[in-house]
């Protein structure tokens, strides 16, 4: 009897974790508390585009302890929950995973550059399901770009240049133009002064 209990306990425990069941067939687990349809649409399209680009990321949004099923003790512990969830969804192969909670993020399976980018992410701006989804939209874009798989063409998703800071490459050009303009202006001033003091005839 004891042996039978030990054998069925792991599967029963897994079934008690809603995200692990959902993520086996979908890219995103949403909290039980409603998430704005627009945010869901954007995040779904973004993760689909990321998968197509070679970055098949699974995302779990955890807004309340009830979203964790039989393991509410892992609420507000995004990395610990990511470690647990990874074991539940990676039995067929390693999965790229992002967990989003109000106090931060947890990750598993990411390449080093994306893991580093995840450590620099700012926590979500709020605690609602929609705010978690909005934070995930920005996070997925940054992680995909850091991993070398930028997401393009998805409305509502930050561009890769915005996500990685590569947009700052225009700064040196602007500085160069300003310096050139200043030098030209200074040259004109000097030329006019020389013409003004030149003896007549």
Language-model-detected regions and their locations in the chain:
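A structural boundary signal for the start of the first folded domain, especially the loop/turn
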Residues: 1-92, 105-201
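Conserved acidic residues
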Residues: 95
């Amino acid at each position: 009897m004891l042996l039978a209990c030990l054998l069925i306990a792991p599967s029963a425990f897994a079934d008690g974790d809603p995200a692990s069941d959902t993520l086996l067939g979908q890219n995103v687990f949403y909290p039980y508390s409603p998430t704005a349809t627009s945010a869901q649409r954007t995040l779904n399209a973004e993760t689909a585009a990321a998968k197509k680009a070679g970055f098949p990321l699974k995302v779990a949004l955890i807004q309340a302890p009830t979203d964790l099923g039989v393991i509410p003790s892992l609420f507000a512990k995004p990395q610990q929950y990511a470690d647990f969830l990874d074991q539940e969804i990676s039995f067929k192969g390693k999965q790229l995973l992002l967990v989003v909670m109000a106090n931060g993020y947890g990750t598993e399976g990411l390449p080093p550059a994306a893991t580093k980018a995840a450590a620099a992410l700012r926590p979500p701006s709020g605690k609602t399901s929609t705010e978690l989804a909005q934070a995930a939209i920005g996070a997925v874009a940054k992680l995909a770009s850091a991993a070398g798989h930028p997401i393009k063409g998805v409305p509502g998703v930050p561009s890769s240049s915005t996500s990685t800071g590569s947009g700052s490459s225009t700064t040196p050009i602007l500085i160069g133009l300003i310096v050139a303009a200043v030098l030209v202006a200074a040259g004109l001033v000097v030329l006019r002064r020389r013409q003004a003091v030149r003896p007549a005839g």
